[in-house]
From Swiss-Prot:
GO terms for molecular function: 18S rRNA aminocarboxypropyltransferase activity; S-adenosyl-L-methionine binding. It catalyses: an N(1)-methylpseudouridine in rRNA + S-adenosyl-L-methionine = N(1)-methyl-N(3)-[(3S)-3-amino-3-carboxypropyl]pseudouridine in rRNA + S-methyl-5'-thioadenosine + H(+). Keywords: Cytoplasm, Ribosome biogenesis, rRNA processing, S-adenosyl-L-methionine, Transferase. Aminocarboxypropyltransferase that catalyzes the aminocarboxypropyl transfer on pseudouridine corresponding to position 914 in M.jannaschii 16S rRNA. It constitutes the last step in biosynthesis of the hypermodified N1-methyl-N3-(3-amino-3-carboxypropyl) pseudouridine (m1acp3-Psi). It comes from Methanothermobacter thermautotrophicus (strain ATCC 29096 / DSM 1053 / JCM 10044 / NBRC 100330 / Delta H). Pfam families: Ribo_biogen_C (PF04034). HAMAP family: TSR3. This is 16S rRNA aminocarboxypropyltransferase.
């Protein structure tokens, strides 16, 4: 499984989830956009299209790419979000990492990648990624009902419908 993270060097390196997974050999950390895998699913919080089980083949064959930068600095115009295709945002999920605990959609890179893997049906790999953090398994437990529902959707539109019903109560 190719998981490649473009690292913008804006974070506290001790707290950075992608650098930790890079050290464990789970993520490849790159500093040049040319090193991102072609055709990968790009995790972009500004994308209008949501991750769905339809993306499974793309994830298996091409991998996942993410941008690790400060949430304070991330912008629609961030360079990685301009260059690649196949951008996806994650539907409503709540962060469990200590920096943004309880905040919807403001996920760490590790949480975003694990959620993507879960939704496309690669649940064991999602659990493995989360197992490197004390709070990681809690992220999956906290969001289990929604992650399960998203993982049973047909496509991105259905994922958005599930999200709407959940937020609307
Ligand atoms: C802004 S960085 C923050 C990383 C943080 N410093 C850490 O240690 O994990 C998080 C990245 O994860 C992905 N991500 C997080 N939440 C997302 C969402 N709701 N939709 C799509 N991608 C998301 C994006 O690639 C985003 O740039």
């Amino acid at each position: 499984m190719k998981i490649v993270v473009y690292h913008a060097e804006e974070c506290d390196r001790k707290k950075c989830t992608s650098l930790k997974l890079g050290r464990k050999g789970k993520f490849k950390i790159v500093s040049s956009l040319n090193q991102l895998p072609r055709g990968a699913l790009v995790l972009n919080p500004f994308s209008e299209k949501a991750v769905s089980p339809e993306d499974r083949d793309m994830v298996l064959r091409r991998g996942i790419a993410a941008l690790d930068c400060s949430w304070k600095k991330v912008k629609k115009s961030s360079v990685i979000f301009q260059t690649a295709r196949n951008h996806r945002s994650l539907p409503f999920l709540v962060a469990a990492n200590p920096t943004n605990y309880g905040k919807p959609c403001i996920l760490s890179t590790a949480e975003a990648v694990a959620a993507t893997l879960y939704i496309v049906g690669l649940k064991d790999i999602a659990s493995d990624i989360m197992s490197y953090f004390k709070w990681g398994p809690h992220f999956l437990d906290l969001n289990r009902e929604l992650l399960e529902a998203y993982s049973r959707a047909e496509n991105s539109l259905e994922v958005v419908e599930i999200q709407k019903k959940f937020i609307g109560g």
